[in-house]
From Swiss-Prot:
Annotated spans, Type E(+) motif: 635-665
GO molecular function, one term: RNA binding
Keyword Repeat: yes
InterPro entries: DYW_dom (IPR032867), E_motif (IPR046848), Eplus_motif (IPR046849), Pentatricopeptide_rpt (IPR002885), PPR_At4g14850-like_plant (IPR046960), TPR-like_helical_dom_sf (IPR011990)
UniProt lineage: Eukaryota, Viridiplantae, Streptophyta, Embryophyta, Tracheophyta
PROSITE patterns reported for this sequence: PPR (PS51375)
One Pfam family in the UniProt entry: PPR_2
Start and stop residues of the PPR repeats: 49-79, 80-114, 115-149, 150-180, 181-215, 216-250, 251-285, 286-316, 317-351, 352-386, 387-421, 422-452, 453-487, 488-523, 524-554
Coiled-coil segments: none
Alphabetical keyword list: Repeat
Region (Type DYW motif): 666-760
Family of the protein in this entry: Belongs to the PPR family. PCMP-H subfamily.
Recorded superkingdom: Eukaryota
UniProt name for this protein: Pentatricopeptide repeat-containing protein At1g20230
Length: 760
């Protein structure tokens, strides 16, 4: 308090002075008393004193009257740091961070340098706003004022850099800190763990030991959580073992943090050891531990462990039930998962968004796509709002069965609840539209995304690859390389697959070599499969076979399947038999191999061999997988089976087929009987061909949609040559765009032409 203002203070009633100086006025006084005190101060002329003004600012701020507090500050001719710091502290406490920065700027323009009390508040503001550049400037100010070595300033500066994701700057501050504590060390350990920097974690732990700072269980839990959340699962397990060797007793948080990593690494034996420890420590009653244990067994494929643990848990708790449903679904027991979900509903258990998302995802991942769509609708009727995880879990179901109407509705929902900025939602939309034949909409979604990660780029490349648009895929890849993102093995799978669709052999070899030479990505089985397909389709079957023999690991069924399919295209019986023999050994119960080899024999007129294959299938009890197609009409998905005569509209479908058949004969088209059984009459062969599920679905669509409406059909098998020719004709005859997605690729029929160029 200045000497000049003392006489003025004496004119203020002692009750007002006592009110302002009371340590409890923030909590016990009233706003009216503050305004009265302000009036008395103005009357006495003591308003210019920094101490009195600071007290007024604090008092007004206590009632969130920040405008009044700021007016007091602005009325001071020569404000002090104390006056500014009072308002900065109050605004920061009220989480008005932007205003805090504004007051700091005014303080700095007055030539006032923040002290060790103001700086921690300012660094906190920068941390909350992720305002790294402003924080860096304040760091410079602290260096100029010599306060950068103050313990409180260093601590707040360190946490600011951590919150802004500037690990390098945070580490520099940490290394200069003279007063490190376990909290600061733990924060740095956790951050390095999230980045998977095991060596740095070990180095800091060593430095802590040298400095006499002992890591506590919170430190270890932070490390485990960091490794787990960043996907560095093996590092998490290594660190868990280190904790145990150091003599620490892992608690329920430690166990819950490491178990997801154990499951993702499929370390079942380690999981069992932890299970034993959990029993010994009496942690089985903890719902988080039980959930993590069930999740671990689910990821490790140990179904008995899932069911046994769930049955041991006495309470019906949402988290445990969610883990149980997810574990069952992950292991193909989706019917059991649905049964349990219905049981939970009957017991009026409070099912949250995680519960619904778990069962929807389980259905979508296990071929229960229609059930997934129904559950999504039921979820909303129940008043549970889907979130950024639910939408990406449900959209694959729309794509799997080409439920474009449902997909668009879900897209609209995502727009209404402002989820489009989420990269997972965006990626799922890109994939859904691509699978529904609307690759142009995939491109639009991609272009509108404010932020794109590698998954988004891969989804778009895969979509165009699925449609056989190799030039577009290569163009997208070139754009990807101009970003800071690095392509991964999935990126190159899309590239190689696209090259294979259109026979770009040179480009395929270029990308195959690029992935290892420029990006250090070792080719996987899927890359070799794509190359075999590419070479085989280009007529270089021997080169494809040589590549298989040179593989650094054993080829799988996908690789041999690619060779066998290429042999079908090139009518090469010798290599087909070699590939088929390998497939018989790898997948003895897969009827597709027998059927494909039989078709190759039939194309060569080798009917004795065809009979031999059929007899072999019969002796093994194998039957050709029945053809099945799906089409969406008026927001409802219909399933049509090959040769099914029980369909309610079968008479109208047959009549329409006869009409189309007559028109085709007029134009000179004859059925391709190579795709029918050879040992039946020609008329019966034709009837069998017209009974193929994709034809039934297309004709059903013609009957039940307005003229000009595009048709979208999904088939569970590869489209045959006769169906391909017929649907080409229908697209011209009926004036329809028809999208067919089979197991190999997309076929876009328009005006009698197919996007595949009749080569698939």
């Amino acid at each position: 308090m200045t000497k000049q203002v003392l006489p003025l203070i004496e004119k203020i009633p002692q009750s007002i002075v006592g009110f302002l100086e009371s340590s409890s006025y923030h909590w016990s006084s009233s706003l009216s008393k503050t305004t009265q005190a302000h009036a008395r101060i103005l009357k006495s002329g003591a308003q210019n004193d920094g101490y009195i003004s600071a007290k007024l600012i604090a008092s007004y701020s206590n009632y969130n009257c920040f405008n009044d507090a700021d007016l007091v500050l602005q009325s001071i001719p020569d404000p002090t740091i104390y006056s500014f710091s009072s308002l900065i502290y109050a605004l920061t406490k009220a989480k008005l961070f932007t205003q805090s920065i504004g007051v700091f700027s005014r303080m700095f323009s007055h030539g006032l340098i923040p002290d060790s009390h103001v700086l921690p508040n300012l660094f906190k503001v920068c941390a909350e706003l992720s305002a790294f550049k402003v924080g860096k400037q304040i760091h410079c100010v602290s260096c100029v004022s010599g306060l950068d070595m103050d313990a409180f300033v260093q601590g707040s500066m360190f946490h600011m850099y951590m919150r802004c994701g500037r690990m390098g700057d945070a580490r520099k501050v940490f290394d200069r800190m003279s007063d490190k504590d376990v909290v600061t060390c733990s924060a740095l350990l956790c951050a390095y763990a999230r980045k998977g920097c095991l060596e740095e974690v070990v180095r800091i732990l060593s430095e802590m030991e040298s400095s006499g700072i002992e890591a506590n269980i919170v430190s270890w839990n932070g490390i485990l959580s960091g490794f787990n959340r960043s996907g560095y699962h093996k590092e998490a397990v290594v660190m868990f073992q280190k904790i145990h060797h150091l003599g620490f007793c892992p608690d329920q948080v430690t166990v819950s943090s490491v178990l997801p990593s154990v499951g993702d690494s499929e370390m079942l034996n380690m999981g069992r050891l932890i299970h034993g420890y959990v029993i010994k420590q009496g942690l089985l009653k903890d719902k988080c531990v039980i959930s993590a244990m069930i999740d671990m067994y689910g990821k490790s494929g140990h179904v008995y462990g899932i069911i046994s643990l769930f049955n041991q848990f006495e309470m019906m708790e949402a988290g445990v039930c969610n883990a149980y449903i997810t574990g069952l679904s992950r292991n193909g027991l989706v019917d059991k998962a649905l049964e349990m979900f219905e049981l939970f509903k009957e017991q009026t258990m409070e099912l949250n968004v995680v519960s619904w998302t778990s069962i929807i995802a389980g259905c979508a991942q296990n071929g229960k796509d229609i059930e997934a769509l129904e559950l999504f609708r039921e979820m909303q009727v129940a008043g549970v709002k889907p979130n950024h995880v639910t939408i990406p879990s449900m959209l694959p179901a729309c794509g799997n069965i080409a439920a474009l109407g449902h997909g668009r509705s879900t897209h609209g929902f995502a727009v209404r609840v402002h989820l489009l900025d989420n990269v997972h939602v965006g990626s799922a939309l890109i994939d859904m539209y691509a699978k529904c034949g609307r690759i142009n909409l995939s491109q639009i979604v991609f272009n509108m995304m404010p932020t794109k990660n590698l998954v988004c780029w891969n989804s778009l490349m895969n979509g165009f690859s699925m449609h056989g648009k190799a030039k577009e895929v290569m163009s997208i890849f070139e754009s990807l390389m101009r970003t800071r993102l690095k392509p991964d093995f999935i990126s190159f799978t899309s590239l190689l697959s696209a090259c294979g669709q259109v026979g770009l052999t040179d480009e395929g070899w270029k990308y195959f070599k690029m992935m290892s030479e420029e990006y250090g990505i070792k080719p996987r089985l899927e890359h070799y499969s794509c190359m075999v397909n590419l070479l085989g389709r280009a007529g270089k079957l021997q080169e494809a076979y040589d590549l298989i023999k040179e593989m650094p690991f054993e080829p799988d069924s996908c690789v041999w399947g690619a060779l066998l399919n290429s042999c079908r295209l090139q009518n090469n019986v010798d290599l087909a038999e070699i590939a088929a023999e390998k497939l018989f050994h790898l997948e003895p119960e897969n009827p597709g191999t027998y059927v494909l080899l039989s078709n190759i024999y039939a194309a060569k007129g080798m009917w004795t061999e065809v009979d031999s294959i059929r007899n072999k299938m019969e002796s093994l009890g194998l039957k050709k997988n029945p053809g099945c197609s799906w089409i969406q009409v008026k927001n409802r998905v219909y399933t049509l089976l090959a040769g099914d005569k029980s369909h309610p509209q079968i008479d109208q479908i047959t009549e329409k087929m006869d009409e189309i058949s007559k028109e085709m004969r007029k134009s000179g088209h004859r059925p391709n009987l190579d795709f029918a059984l050879h040992d039946v009459e020609e008329q019966e062969q034709e009837q069998m061909l017209w009974g193929h599920s994709e034809k039934l679905a297309v004709v059903f669509g013609l009957l039940n949609t307005p003229d000009g409406t595009p048709l979208q059909v999904i088939k569970n098998l590869r489209i045959c040559g006769d169906c391909h020719a017929v649907i080409k004709f229908i697209s011209s005859y009926a004036g329809r765009e028809i999208f067919i997605r089979d197991t190999n690729r997309f076929h876009h029929f328009k005006d009698g032409i197919c996007s595949c160029g009749d080569f698939w």
